[in-house]
A protein has these predicted regions:
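Short, flexible segments with low predicted structural confidence
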Residues: 14-16, 103-104, 145-147
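Bilobed "Venus flytrap"/periplasmic-binding protein-like clamshell domains
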Residues: 1-46, 141, 160, 164-169
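Pocket-lining segment of extracytoplasmic ligand-binding domains
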Residues: 23, 28-119, 123-124
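Flexible glycine/proline-enriched surface loops and loop-helix/loop-strand junctions
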Residues: 1-4, 112-118, 153-158
């Protein structure tokens, strides 16, 4: 039973995301706990929360710490809810959290993610943004090696979840690299 859900710190991106996702999923009958990330982990560990939402990279340290003490059971989001979330909020994209992420996980877990964006002011010269974007893609292997979720960095998914206009310098690279038609 999800009676007490830690939805993230007040006015945070995690709180906004968790409330959006829970709303689309039709979950309303629970007590919202507006807690910081470490406090949410403590509440889970101590049995004072039934679930906690995290909008963070994985693996996430406090959850790793909990999984050492007690099994972690991530809640999968059903496919239909993932599709509805994507329709309502196109910047959320499907993601699968591997079962090897936290101790005690017995299966891969379907969820949603927000892509990280590298933003530039319109005042930054096009050539500078082009050069940085090109360098990022030239070094994908190094980026992938730097974090467990690096494997999700692909040319095919480069623009997935992007709902804002591209900087002209980035657009130039994406067209040149045939990522953007």
């Amino acid at each position: 039973d999800l009676k007490r859900v830690a939805v993230g710190p007040p006015a945070s991106g995690t709180q906004l995301a968790s409330e959006r996702i829970l709303s689309v999923a039709g979950l309303k009958d629970f007590r919202k706990l507006e807690l910081g990330f470490n406090e949410s982990a403590e509440y889970l560990r101590d049995g004072n929360a039934d679930a906690a939402a995290y909008q963070t990279g994985i693996p996430y340290g406090p959850v790793v710490d909990i999984s050492v003490v007690q099994p972690v059971d991530l809640l999968a989001i059903p496919d239909g809810v993932i599709q509805e979330i994507g329709k309502t909020y196109p910047f959320y994209v499907p993601v699968t959290i591997p079962r090897t992420t936290y101790k005690g996980m017995s299966r891969d877990v379907k969820s949603v993610a927000v892509k990280m964006l590298l933003l530039a002011s319109a005042k930054v010269p096009d050539e500078d943004v082009y050069t940085v974007t090109k360098a990022l893609f030239a070094n994908l292997d190094r980026l992938k090696a730097s974090h467990k979720m690096g494997e999700t960095l692909t040319r095919e998914k480069a623009l997935e979840g992007v709902t804002i206009p591209l900087h002209p310098g980035a657009e130039k690279f994406y067209r040149e690299a045939a990522i953007l038609k």
